[in-house]
């Protein structure tokens, strides 16, 4: 393609698993073209930021980082902004950060070598912002960060248009990958030694196979879990509107599908949910929770909650706190509402004062912390299978993840090297905290 071999690059990733996987595609694509990845921006000739725009704080972090580099006088480097902020802001990024030379959205990663050649040829600024492509599904050079767990994208974009969310604008409409393509990549991963796969999408539940097979998400999930050598299958993220009973049935029927369901509720108030354009009520959400809790297996439940959406009253907030008591989530991600461009909520009045949003957020987090302490304590004495991920050198322990997505630090007679990484071990839980478990190996390797 004409790219200059030997160019060094650094990439920093902000945001979700989708962004992390996108960065893996960027790294693999550039390595295949002869570029060399380095560990620090100071050592790189090309500096990329793969960005998140879901909240204003994440966006500002990127621009602050760019300004710091400008002040530090890192001359001679090429700076590139990738991902959701790139898609959202486009060429306006050049005005906010004039030393940036490249702006590329999430559907343009395979074009990066070509764009870099344009910069080498003398173009001062290059953009890649088209969403009219499915090329991100088929990036053959993906360089995965983890040798045992792999991300696998099954759907891109979102059609839901929630009032607060910029994702439909930055990621485009829903585009499902063919089941044949998904299955081929999943089989290829197991053949390379990967034992855990996480199916990714802005809304995995709305997956619809565009090929004649016509699989829905529940069918795809079951088929991936049946692949020989596939030990664990996870998925994220789900939209409650599209979370249907057959998904739970598929999980019950195949133990390779992990005991964890992330089902973002956003609010416990039906009034706020309607204002958010979430397309379900509190009762409809709780009906799905009933499906999960009445299943054959015990599933870990996690969620997302937005605090301080315009018009949220004290009574609305109390309904959200009440929902925590009713559902008993194993953990949650909570955020203050952040106005985003190109969203309908941007024009809403009755904004909640920042100090009140902060008070509500802390109240919510305090309640959830108590629930998590209790939920984790219930696991003391149980034996959990963990996939060993590494070592906690400071504590002299190993770190693993359970099928229910809890972090478990544990002791084991093998205290040297990394011989256990990638193995599945039974671990007895002996202690617990609000965010993790502690245990000891229940069997020698």
From Swiss-Prot:
Cross-referenced Pfam families, in alphabetical order? Answer: Radical_SAM (PF04055), TRAM (PF01938), UPF0004 (PF00919)
Q: Which residue windows are coiled coil?
A: none
Entry's Gene Ontology cellular component terms? cytosol
Question: How cofactor binds (record note)?
Answer: Binds 2 [4Fe-4S] clusters. One cluster is coordinated with 3 cysteines and an exchangeable S-adenosyl-L-methionine.
SUPFAM superfamilies tied to this protein: Radical SAM enzymes
Residue ranges constituting the TRAM domain according to the UniProt record? 377-443
Q: Which residues bind [4Fe-4S] cluster 1?
A: 16, 52, 84
Under CDD domains, the record lists: Radical_SAM
Question: According to its UniProt entry, what is the function of this protein?
Answer: Catalyzes the methylthiolation of N6-(dimethylallyl)adenosine (i(6)A), leading to the formation of 2-methylthio-N6-(dimethylallyl)adenosine (ms(2)i(6)A) at position 37 in tRNAs that read codons beginning with uridine.
Q: Which family does it belong to?
A: Belongs to the methylthiotransferase family. MiaB subfamily.
State the protein's name.
tRNA-2-methylthio-N(6)-dimethylallyladenosine synthase
Which organism is the protein's source? Solibacter usitatus (strain Ellin6076)
């Amino acid at each position: 393609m004409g790219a200059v071999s030997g160019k060094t690059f650094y990439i920093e990733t902000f945001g979700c698993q989708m962004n992390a996987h996108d960065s893996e595609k960027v790294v693999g694509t550039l390595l295949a073209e002869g570029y060399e990845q380095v560990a620090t921006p100071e050592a790189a000739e090309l500096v990329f930021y793969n960005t998140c725009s879901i909240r204003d704080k994440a966006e500002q972090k990127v621009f602050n980082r760019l300004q710091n580099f400008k002040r530090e006088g890192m001359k001679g480097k090429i700076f590139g902004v990738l991902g959701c902020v790139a898609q959202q802001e486009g060429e306006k990024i050049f005005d906010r950060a004039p030393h940036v030379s490249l702006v590329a959205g999430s559907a343009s990663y395979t074009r990066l070598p070509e764009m870099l050649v344009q910069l080498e040829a003398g173009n001062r600024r290059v953009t890649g912002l088209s969403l009219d492509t499915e090329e991100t599904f088929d990036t053959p050079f993906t360089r995965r960060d983890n040798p045992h767990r792999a991300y696998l994208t099954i759907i891109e974009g979102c059609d839901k248009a929630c009032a607060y969310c910029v994702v439909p604008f930055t990621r485009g409409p829903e585009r499902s990958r063919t089941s044949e393509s998904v299955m081929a990549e999943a089989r290829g991963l197991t053949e390379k030694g990967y034992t855990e796969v996480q199916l990714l999408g802005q809304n995995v539940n709305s997956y619809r196979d565009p090929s004649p097979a016509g699989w829905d998400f529940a069918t795809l999930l079951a088929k991936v879990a049946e692949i020989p050598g596939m030990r664990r299958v996870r998925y994220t993220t789900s939209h409650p509107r599209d979370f249907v009973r057959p998904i739970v049935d598929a999980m019950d029927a195949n133990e390779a599908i992990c005991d964890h369901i992330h089902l973002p509720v956003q609010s416990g108030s039906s009034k706020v949910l309607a204002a958010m354009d979430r397309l379900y009520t509190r009762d409809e959400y709780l009906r799905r929770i009933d499906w999960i809790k009445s299943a054959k297996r015990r599933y870990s439940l996690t969620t997302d909650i937005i605090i301080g959406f315009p018009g949220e009253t004290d009574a609305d907030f109390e309904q959200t706190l009440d929902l925590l008591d009713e559902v008993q989530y194993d953990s949650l991600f909570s955020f203050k509402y952040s106005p985003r461009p190109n969203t309908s909520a941007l024009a809403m009045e009755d904004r909640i004062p920042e100090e009140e949003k902060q008070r509500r957020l802390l109240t919510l987090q305090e309640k959830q912390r108590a629930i998590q302490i209790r939920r984790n304590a219930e696991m003391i004495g149980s034996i959990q299978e963990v996939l060993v991920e590494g070592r906690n050198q400071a504590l002299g322990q190993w770190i693993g993840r359970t099928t229910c997505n809890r972090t478990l630090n544990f002791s084991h007679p093998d205290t040297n090297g990394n011989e256990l990484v990638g193995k599945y071990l039974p671990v007895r839980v002996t202690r617990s905290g609000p965010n993790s478990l502690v245990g000891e190996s229940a069997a020698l390797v």
